[in-house]
Regions:
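A structural signal for isolated positions on well-ordered beta-strands in alpha/beta enzyme cores
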Residues: 65-67, 97
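N-terminal binding-site loop/beta-alpha segment at the start of enzyme catalytic domains
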Residues: 1-64, 122
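Proline-centered loop/turn at the N-terminus of a beta-strand
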Residues: 63-65, 127-128
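Glycine/proline-rich, positively charged
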Residues: 35, 75-128
């Protein structure tokens, strides 16, 4: 597996990740992917697969770089915080490695969203 640095974080992630959009396979195929080196797992609030990902990474969390996303309809400050808390509950974890905006929402100032994202980092709920 080839790795690349995630921006200027010093963190190296696999070039190939396991995407979970429309994923229906349960934890075992994801676990096999992790065994084979595909340790970047991408999920999202919208995919409704965070619980399956959580089951797959249980006991393997130290091997996985976990990325998930917040819906564009949840970009107000309080909604971002609630969405991240829900994702963590579904993932059965205490930190998201990379929390991303799934798509923008022109009705919400980006400064409001980014302030909430920074708060998640400050609280230790999100790394990047």
């Amino acid at each position: 597996m080839e790795y690349r640095e995630l921006g200027d974080t010093g963190v190296r992630v696999p070039e190939i990740g396991l995407g979970t959009w429309k994923y229906k396979g349960g934890p075992e195929p994801l676990r096999k992917g992790i065994e084979l080196g595909a340790t970047l797992i991408d999920t999202a609030e919208m995919y409704k697969t965070e619980d399956a990902v959580g089951a797959a990474i249980k006991g393997r969390r130290d091997k996985v770089f976990l990325a998930t996303k917040v819906l564009g309809s949840n970009l107000r400050r309080d909604a971002v915080l609630r969405a991240a808390e829900k994702s963590l509950r579904l993932l059965d974890d205490n930190v998201i490695d990379l929390y991303q905006i799934h798509w923008s929402n022109r009705s919400v100032p980006i400064a409001e969203t980014m302030s909430a994202m920074e708060e998640l980092v400050d609280r230790g709920m999100v790394r990047y």
